[in-house]
Design a protein with these regions (language model features):
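AAA+ P-loop NTPase catalytic core and its hallmark functional loops
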Residues: 2-173
Length: 173
């Protein structure tokens, strides 16, 4: 399996194994490309179920977050600065607000897969935020659970969908 990964060629059937070995066990972020409609997202969701089948996740809402970058605003991934009253200084301070979808992954012990889907259809500004997340495991300045696996997925150019050139650091995950 490892030779196939380093050659960047695995089949759709091998996605779950790659996630479980390289993502869950070794804490690597992974990137998968393929033609549109071949089942990348479904296989990645199956990997989340396989990853959590022997542990109690009853306190979690989900073990799989499917975040489709091309449909979301940049602030949905990086956060939005919001002014708040600061009672200590009688002034205003800025805090970063994150969408509710992310709150669970900041809880230590959350176990599952975060899929940054449609990555190749995301604009370069969204890709750069996604790269920071894939690389540093930080969203809006907050570290995510050590048990979370981050996976990027995108369509190959020429597969019929809208695609942007992936930033080199994102493409090389």
């Amino acid at each position: 399996l490892s030779n196939m990964l380093f050659e960047h060629k695995i089949t759709i059937r091998e996605i779950a194994d790659a996630i479980l070995v390289f993502g869950a066990r070794h804490k690597f972020s992974l990137m998968f490309y393929g033609n549109s409609g071949i089942g990348k997202s479904e296989k990645i969701q199956q990997a989340a179920n396989e990853m959590t089948k022997d542990i109690d996740i009853s306190q979690q809402k989900t073990n799989f977050i499917d975040f489709r970058l091309c449909f979301e605003a940049v602030e949905s991934l990086g956060g939005l600065w919001v002014p708040q009253d600061d009672v200590n200084t009688a002034g205003i301070k800025l805090t970063k607000a994150m969408p509710e979808i992310w709150e669970e992954v900041f809880v230590e012990g959350w176990t599952g897969i975060i899929l940054l889907d449609e990555l190749s259809s995301a604009t370069p500004s969204k890709q750069s935020i996604a790269y920071q997340f894939l690389n540093e495991r930080v969203l809006g300045g907050r570290k995510i659970s050590n048990n979370a696996v981050i996976v990027g997925a995108g369509n190959m150019q020429g597969s019929g969908g809208l695609t942007f050139d992936l930033l080199k650091p994102v493409a090389n995950r």
